[in-house]
Amino acid sequence: MTIKTPTVKVPGLGTDPLEQRIKEKEKKWKYKIAVLSGKGGVGKSTVAVNLTAALAKMGYFVGILDADIHGPNVAKMLGVDKEEVYAEKFDDGHFEMIPPTTDFMGQVTPIKVMSMGMMVPEDQPVIWRGPLVTKAIKQLLGDVKWGSLDFMIIDFPPGTGDEILTVVQSIKLDAAIIVTTPQEVALLDTGKAVNMMKKMEVPYVAVVENMSYLICPHCGNKIDIFGEGGGEKLAQKEGVDFLGKIPIDLKAREASDLGIPIVLYEDTPAAKAFMELAEKLVNKLKEIKGDGGKE
């Protein structure tokens, strides 16, 4: 990581400067959205990245924080994994990282990205215990120059572990998007994630069913590879919203490898589904808070 060190004055802080910085920064984030899943392999990060890009495509200012310390891939999926991360030094001695941005050649409002994937070599594991992971996440929240955002998207690792607790205890989430697939084993773990967010009193909790179906490229028929309707039934059972289905898209792998969100391939079924998802989310948050979600 390359460091540049202009000195910036900061106001007096309390007994826990990092916690205070988080609280000050949070005031500039209109909506804080968690994206999580009960288990791995459901395409959670794909949903987080494409929701981010869809919101930016709609003209919103969006930041995405990759809270998966041990398996970060958001930066690669957004094509900024090779970007250098710079930092500014403040007069109290702490540094704040400057998040790389991407606008995909003007196709979207610039997206701010921060991930451990930009700070460690691709093949180097992060072998940290819980306390170090907790500190790292707090630093990604409080020691990054996020600035004013319409949406802060936080991509969590699979499961219901320390990372989620750390964020929920540090900032007030406005919504949690739980990603699942139609498979029964995924739905079982999804229910746990939904109930965790409800217990944490997150104001809005919703389910998204990813890899919901495939449109055959030859005949155009819909194929339910992993079953049908499981995500919607789970949402009904748990009493939360169902935001929609994201189809399997053959272009998604190519797009991900290139560091381009599939939502920018406008004519694909997945792109259309992600835009609908983003619009539904904005409308729901507008309904809850009584405004359009945009500064």
Swiss-Prot record:
Annotated positions binding ATP: G38, K39, G40, G41, V42, G43, K44, S45
Gene3D superfamilies: P-loop containing nucleotide triphosphate hydrolases (3.40.50.300)
Keyword Hydrolase: yes
Coiled coil: none
Keyword Iron: yes
Endpoints of the signal sequence: none
Annotated keywords: ATP-binding, Hydrolase, Iron, Iron-sulfur, Metal-binding, Nucleotide-binding
GO molecular function: 4 iron, 4 sulfur cluster binding; ATP binding; ATP hydrolysis activity; ATP-dependent FeS chaperone activity; metal ion binding
InterPro entries hit by this protein: Mrp-like_CS, Mrp/NBP35_ATP-bd, NUBPL-like, P-loop_NTPase, YlxH/NBP35
CDD domains reported for this sequence: Mrp_NBP35
GO annotation terms (biological process): iron-sulfur cluster assembly
Protein family: Belongs to the Mrp/NBP35 ATP-binding proteins family.
Cited function: Binds and transfers iron-sulfur (Fe-S) clusters to target apoproteins. Can hydrolyze ATP.
HAMAP family in UniProt: Mrp_NBP35
Subunit structure: Homodimer.
Record-linked PANTHER family: IRON-SULFUR PROTEIN NUBPL
Annotated protein name in UniProt: Iron-sulfur cluster carrier protein
Organism ancestry: Archaea, Methanobacteriati, Methanobacteriota, Thermococci, Thermococcales
